[in-house]
């Protein structure tokens, strides 16, 4: 019986944590579109959080605000956004600069939310990890390869490291057990080629061994903001690199995760504490902030491409063509989500 209540409690925490994470990420994104549309004089017909049947709604200032049953999405419906409209306040009648602002605002809000969450994460830490080597473990392979105490790791394989976590991420990406490091030593840049680090296999996956510790520094207002900013840049770059690795085949497509995988990750993070959940929230909110700006039809980035073309041509592309292209992109994204969800379920079963 105790085991049952424990499992039920764990399930409830996962559900609540998932609703919280998805809800706040979607709400902030749509809020960006909503606020900039209102600021630009564009008529917003509806602002809804969630999908499916409406649980609660009210109308104010010509806009219907609603909460829907399934916490898996949300939307801002603007006049003339997806159909021809001659009404005052139509999206298509607004200056192209205003429409660009409305289009990118959702992604910008996601990135800002990620930064704010990361400020909270950094504040919860006792010290801020630097990129300066403090000590090595006994038999350290990196030390034997030339890395020294006091070295500040600037780049791995030519890619700049903003935070200590970047070092781990770049080591993991090499998949070769060695990397080229650029370090600051006594104020001078030193290049260390073929620095070896240990790996081991666990459940068919190569795991990385970091055989040194880095220095920690005390927190100040400036250092917290700087670290949170660097974390934001780092996570954003990780999203871009991961997408690039998927496209180039560096990472197998069966590693792609969808909503089920995200819920599983939220479950694990929530069991580890608030700090881990907040870190995952930061990654999940920065991810759509970057992904939504990709030039893919049906995404904000796809609409941005149309607006840029309109700016260059000085006239818009026919809306019927834009709608058709966006519909094709939407079908593609749904197919990708189904594939990712199938991957997630397969991993859970296996």
Locate the predicted segments by residue:
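Alpha-helical transmembrane segments of multi-pass membrane proteins
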Residues: 22-26, 77, 110, 114, ...
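Membrane interface segments of multi-pass transport proteins and intramembrane proteases
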Residues: 56-58, 135-138, 307-324
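Internal alpha-helical transmembrane segments
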Residues: 17, 28, 39, 46, ...
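Small-residue-rich helix-interface/hinge motifs
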Residues: 10-86, 294-313
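Juxtamembrane boundary at the C-terminal end of a transmembrane helix
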Residues: 339-350
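Transmembrane alpha-helix interface/packing and boundary motifs in multi-pass membrane proteins
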Residues: 245-249, 284-299
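PDZ peptide-recognition modules
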Residues: 2-12, 81-97, 105, 109-256
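Hydrophobic alpha-helical segments of integral membrane proteins
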Residues: 8, 47-48, 66-75, 100, ...
């Amino acid at each position: 019986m105790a085991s049952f209540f424990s499992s039920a409690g764990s399930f409830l925490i996962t559900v609540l944590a998932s609703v919280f994470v998805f809800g706040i990420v979607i709400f902030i994104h749509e809020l960006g579109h909503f606020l900039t549309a209102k600021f630009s004089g564009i008529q917003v017909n509806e602002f809804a959080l969630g999908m499916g049947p409406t649980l609660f709604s009210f109308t104010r200032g010509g806009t219907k605000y609603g909460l829907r049953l399934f916490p898996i999405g949300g939307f801002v419906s603007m006049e003339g956004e997806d159909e021809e409209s001659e009404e005052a306040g139509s999206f298509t009648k607004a200056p192209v600069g205003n429409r660009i602002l409305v289009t990118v605002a959702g992604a910008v809000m996601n990135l800002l939310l990620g930064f704010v969450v990361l400020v909270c994460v950094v504040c919860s830490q006792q010290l801020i990890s630097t990129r300066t080597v403090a000590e090595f473990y006994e038999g350290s392979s990196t030390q034997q390869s030339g890395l020294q105490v006091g070295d500040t790791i600037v780049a791995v394989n030519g890619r700049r490291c903003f935070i200590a976590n970047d070092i781990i991420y770049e080591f993991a990406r090499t998949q070769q057990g060695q990397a080229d490091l650029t370090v600051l030593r006594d104020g001078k840049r030193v290049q260390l080629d073929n620095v070896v680090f240990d790996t081991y296999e666990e459940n068919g996956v190569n795991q990385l061994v970091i055989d040194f510790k880095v220095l920690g520094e005390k927190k100040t207002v400036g250092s917290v903001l700087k670290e949170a900013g660097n974390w934001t840049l780092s996570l954003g770059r990780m999203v871009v690199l991961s997408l690039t690795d998927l496209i180039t085949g560096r990472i197998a497509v069966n590693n792609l995760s969808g909503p089920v995988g995200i819920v599983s990750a939220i479950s694990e993070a929530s069991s580890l504490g608030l700090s881990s959940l907040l870190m995952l929230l930061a990654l999940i909110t920065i991810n759509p902030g970057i992904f939504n700006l990709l030039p893919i039809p049906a995404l904000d980035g796809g609409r941005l491409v149309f607006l840029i073309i309109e700016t260059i041509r000085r006239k818009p592309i026919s809306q019927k063509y834009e709608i058709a292209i966006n519909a094709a992109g939407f079908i593609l994204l749904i197919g990708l989500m189904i594939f990712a969800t199938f991957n997630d379920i397969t991993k859970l079963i296996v």
